[in-house]
């Protein structure tokens, strides 16, 4: 079955071979979808016939957002920590263990309901591809439970057993557990492995050991680094074949050179800095150096509890030195690059049919009018979603 989506006032394709700029913008456009894939893109007047039609009434249409960094499987509410930070308390990474305790106690059905609620929020915000991390179990049983829940919702599941050291373990003992029994147990459910390399979590040697174990298990590599301070691990980790380094607030020139030389994506997470009152990363410095940049939510219960890419777009252009064009690209095609995907974050023949129409004449309004619900319709894999108001419950 095919459908032609026509009368698109302004279409962003992220395909520079069409349109007039890097965003591949086309005015008065149409898109033909066959099944879950895009079959044709071009001017409305030239659109081929299809079985069905959908009239966008002149709306602006963009690719679905690609959120390449999120932590949506957990239990428990940490709003009190946000309140403490807003009252002057300094952010440290210790709150993760509060979520671990609640998550270990939660049944799988409850965790699935939490993730479903967050994904519904994301869909209402225009997100159609989500990377989801484990990391709130820190024992074999719970990490497997989190991986199973996440894998029932997305193909982009990341094993983050190396979030912090489990409270019942010594650091070296826990690294052995992560690299051995835990990794083996979660392997059927995950595509990626990630490590939180920061003071209070894992040091560079431990980080490299865990990443190498992930490589041996056939997983793609991701890294949290340079969020709380400079990191020594990034150049060495990039040589292992990282897909992305995430946070990237405190990067050295050597770090940026390594990202560029290895084609590693720098994923920026402005909602984390917004919530923790930490300095924002300098996105312009990365773009000027030719590094590929992604923009994601870091949706998590402690330091960035937002599911909204549009919110992150607004922060990125105001606080991080991104142009609006760079921000939109980073939240779509950039996120796809961070996941080594070429079938999402773009509107072109062969790509998955993920489209978002806006209740605005231009995508610029996503940043120009922050906080306004401008997402009108969302098409994911060729199906228009029903955007019900999600009901998120964090405590059983």
Swiss-Prot record:
EC number: 3.5.2.7
GO cellular component: cytoplasm
Record's protein name: Imidazolonepropionase
Protein family according to the UniProt entry: Belongs to the metallo-dependent hydrolases superfamily. HutI family.
Binding site for Zn(2+): 69, 71, 224, 298
Main location: cytoplasm
UniProt-annotated binding residues for N-formimidoyl-L-glutamate: 136, 300, 302
Name of the coding gene: hutI
Keyword match Transcription regulation: no
Binding residues for Fe(3+): 69, 71, 224, 298
UniProt organism field: Cutibacterium acnes (strain DSM 16379 / KPA171202) (Propionibacterium acnes)
Catalyzed reactions per annotation: 4-imidazolone-5-propanoate + H2O = N-formimidoyl-L-glutamate
């Amino acid at each position: 079955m095919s459908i032609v989506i026509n009368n698109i006032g302004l279409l962003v394709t992220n395909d520079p071979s069409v349109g007039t700029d890097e965003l591949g913008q086309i005015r008065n456009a149409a898109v033909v979808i066959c099944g879950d894939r895009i079959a044709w893109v071009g001017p409305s007047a030239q659109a081929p016939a299809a079985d069905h039609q959908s009239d966008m009434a002149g709306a602006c249409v963009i690719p679905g957002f690609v959120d390449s960094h999120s932590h949506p499987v957990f239990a428990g509410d940490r709003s009190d920590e946000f309140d403490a930070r807003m009252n002057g308390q300094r952010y440290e990474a210790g709150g993760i263990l509060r979520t671990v305790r609640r998550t270990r106690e939660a049944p799988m059905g409850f965790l699935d309901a939490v993730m479903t609620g967050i994904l519904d929020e994301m869909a209402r915000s225009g997100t159609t591809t989500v990377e989801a991390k484990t990391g709130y179990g820190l024992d074999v049983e719970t990490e497997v439970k989190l991986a199973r829940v996440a894998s029932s919702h997305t193909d982009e599941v990341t094993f983050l057993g190396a979030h912090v050291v489990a409270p019942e373990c010594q650091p070296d003992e826990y690294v052995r557990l992560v690299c051995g029994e835990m990794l083996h147990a979660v392997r059927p459910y995950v595509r990626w492995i990630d490590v939180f390399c920061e003071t209070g979590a894992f040091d560079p040697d431990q980080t490299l050991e865990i990443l190498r174990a992930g490589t041996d298990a056939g997983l793609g590599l991701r890294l949290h680094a340079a969020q709380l301070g400079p990191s020594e691990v990034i150049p060495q980790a990039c040589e292992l074949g990282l897909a992305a380094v995430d946070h990237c607030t405190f990067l050295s020139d050597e770090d940026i050179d390594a990202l560029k030389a290895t084609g590693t994506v720098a994923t920026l997470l402005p909602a984390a800095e917004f919530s923790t009152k930490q300095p924002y990363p300098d996105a312009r410095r990365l773009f000027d150096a030719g590094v590929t940049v992604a923009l994601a939510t870091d949706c998590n219960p402690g330091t960035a509890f937002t599911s909204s890419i549009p919110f992150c777009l607004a922060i990125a252009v105001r606080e991080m030195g991104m142009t609006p064009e760079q921000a939109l690209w980073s939240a779509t095609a950039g996120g796809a690059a961070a996941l080594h995907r070429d079938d999402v974050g773009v509107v072109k023949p062969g790509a998955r049919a993920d489209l978002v129409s806006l209740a605005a004449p231009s995508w610029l309004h996503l940043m120009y009018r922050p906080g306004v619900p401008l997402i009108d319709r969302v098409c994911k894999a060729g199906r228009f979603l029903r955007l019900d108001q999600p009901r998120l419950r964090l405590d059983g």
